[in-house]
Amino acid sequence: MLNRSKMLQEIDNLLTSEGYKTSNIYDQGSFDLVARKNLLILLLKTFLNIDSINEANAHEMKQLANIFLASPIIIGEKSRNGILEEGVIYERYDIPAISFETLKNMILYKEYPEILADRGGYFVKVDGNVIKQYREEYSLSLKDLADLAHVSRATMYKYENEIVRANTETAMILEEILNTKVTLDIDLLKPTISEDIEYSNVEGADDLSKLGYGILSTNKSPFDAVAKMKSSKDKSSLLTNVEKNRSEKTLKRMAIPLKDLSMITSSEPVFIINNDKIKDSLGTIPVIKSWELKEFENPSELLKIIRERKDNM
């Protein structure tokens, strides 16, 4: 059995070998690793036992995935019910959880899992169009096919309209009757876009809201907040740390993950600082003073200053 540190290293090695850019490892936060390949971003969290994740951790992970247009995935070894099976998706708080072998199959071979483990057994998503097409080719009514598959007509109707999932046994029977594949692969690497982001107030960054940014405060991430325009086609975001009476030494240390994660997520990193003694940058991160933030009339002015200070380093 892998320990968690070894698992994280193997995940990092796997992704980099396939051309992904990976962040540093942040194993104390709501995510451990962020990886990017072209437009695809993965937000990954590892547990030896996937039941170790709590609701607050999962919620923050999902919120960040929505902001970054990323796919959140939990990778683990086991659950309370036993070892995670290869090719099976488990869910915890609506986040897919898989074994390392399942991740490896997706990354190396583009072999995506079909089976979902849920209360009551194993289920698959079925292709309703394929079922209907082949049923009609065989001149079977809904009831005919339902009887052959040992389900009700209403259930068969739901399969054809993709309202419900089928258990694996029923899917196998359908494939045998229709002589074709009816199950659907589940591409966990493809993000599920959701607008359900719970923006909040962040002390020291409230003036970003006046510029039209929605701000997501974080508790378990290597940055204080992430800000994104609420009503714009511009999908880029700001990764933000605020002063919070921290020493300059502490802030400089915090600049390292801020820079690292901004590069992977294509975000603009910025410190929002009250202390006038601190110059226009900390480490390699631009600094915006709180009083400056109050004076900006639109986000373009803010972004212009951030980029100018970045260029002047």
Curated annotation (Swiss-Prot):
Entries under NCBIfam families matching the protein: PRK04140.1 (NF003162)
Lineage: Archaea, Methanobacteriati, Methanobacteriota, Methanomada group, Methanobacteria
SMART domains registered for this protein in UniProt: HTH_XRE
UniProt keyword Transcription, yes or no: yes
Protein name: Putative HTH-type transcriptional regulatory protein Msm_0453
Residues within the DNA-binding region(s): 142-161
InterPro entries per the UniProt record, alphabetical: Arc_TR_HTH, Cro/C1-type_HTH, Lambda_DNA-bd_dom_sf
Gene3D superfamilies on file: lambda repressor-like DNA-binding domains
Record bears the keyword Phosphoprotein: no
Entry keywords, A to Z: DNA-binding, Transcription, Transcription regulation
Domain of life according to the entry: Archaea
Native organism: Methanobrevibacter smithii (strain ATCC 35061 / DSM 861 / OCM 144 / PS)
SUPFAM superfamilies reported for this sequence: lambda repressor-like DNA-binding domains (SSF47413)
GO molecular function, one term: DNA-binding transcription factor activity
Domain HTH cro/C1-type: 131-189
